[in-house]
């Protein structure tokens, strides 16, 4: 165990706090940095420093997010905390801060509230894979039965949205007492228990490079005497010379073989996630491939035209629409590298959607796009972004 201290390269995991306003998300975030710094290294961030989160622009959307870091014995955590409910909604839908797992903070005194529910639902929709619960303000509840009742309510809520409610770790504690250095069960030890739950309950994330190969097509060139070169940034996986790939999206899927990988005009044996590469394709004409398609490992991704999405509509101040839209709205959906027109079907009982709202909708595209659940997209009108969304469920 003593050796672990010297390993600089701890596994990196992204987490964040979610939950109802004033249930103690930011206090807990501060406590995690303080106790992490004392035990495992890192830097303590005080409540005020976290609360004064700067505004950031992510894809033209204004989001306030605080980023902090702390360590456990085995991992390095990057943690996001948002000051306002609207910031959470935007953050989760745009994927500005991707989470490998979330810490749901729920006040033991109040129990689950509307935003508790909404954040769990959003986590399900946008594909946050794991949730660990911190029942905060346990110092304000004397009745053990009441604590049990709140815990049961939280478990039921999690199960309702397809999280494993019965198996989810729920830690009782007081973030405020922990910050003050209190050593009772609900003080510092509760924070250590929470970190241990993060370590054990959130599995190691799969690195992009270990996932099946995928590269969105940005450009297509024809090089005389050599054939067709497709350029783009490799989103995931590794591609080697001689690998068979599929070209997916817009038109019928077809297979080909990669006969060359180039980067910065140099020939390589392979390209991997994060690389901007040019791939030479065997027997492929320039007109066989277009921007908006993807090159991928055969069978790893399918083209779809209809999906359920969770969408945030930009407000007027963010450069979005000034007026609401109604059912049958037909904007462009920008996936990876291209715009595809689609029609929006609103949920029953929703007549119109106002700028600044978030809404669940079913989208039908005029051409198929290679997609998985969790894929992010922008909604545009004539090149101007008016919304951001994520594929929650594929319909067909």
Swiss-Prot record:
Q: Which residues form a coiled coil?
A: none
Give the top-level enzyme category: hydrolase
Q: Which CDD domains does the UniProt record give?
A: EF_Tu (cd01884), EFTU_II (cd03697), EFTU_III (cd03707)
Task: Offer an example of a GO molecular function term for this protein.
Answer: translation elongation factor activity
For the region G2, give the residue spans. Answer: 60-64
Q: Where is this region: G5?
A: 174-176
Identify the stretch(es) annotated as G4. 136-139
Q: What is its biological role?
A: GTP hydrolase that promotes the GTP-dependent binding of aminoacyl-tRNA to the A-site of ribosomes during protein biosynthesis.
Record HAMAP family: EF_Tu_B
Q: What is this protein called?
A: Elongation factor Tu 1
Could you tell me which species this protein originates from?
Xanthomonas campestris pv. campestris (strain B100)
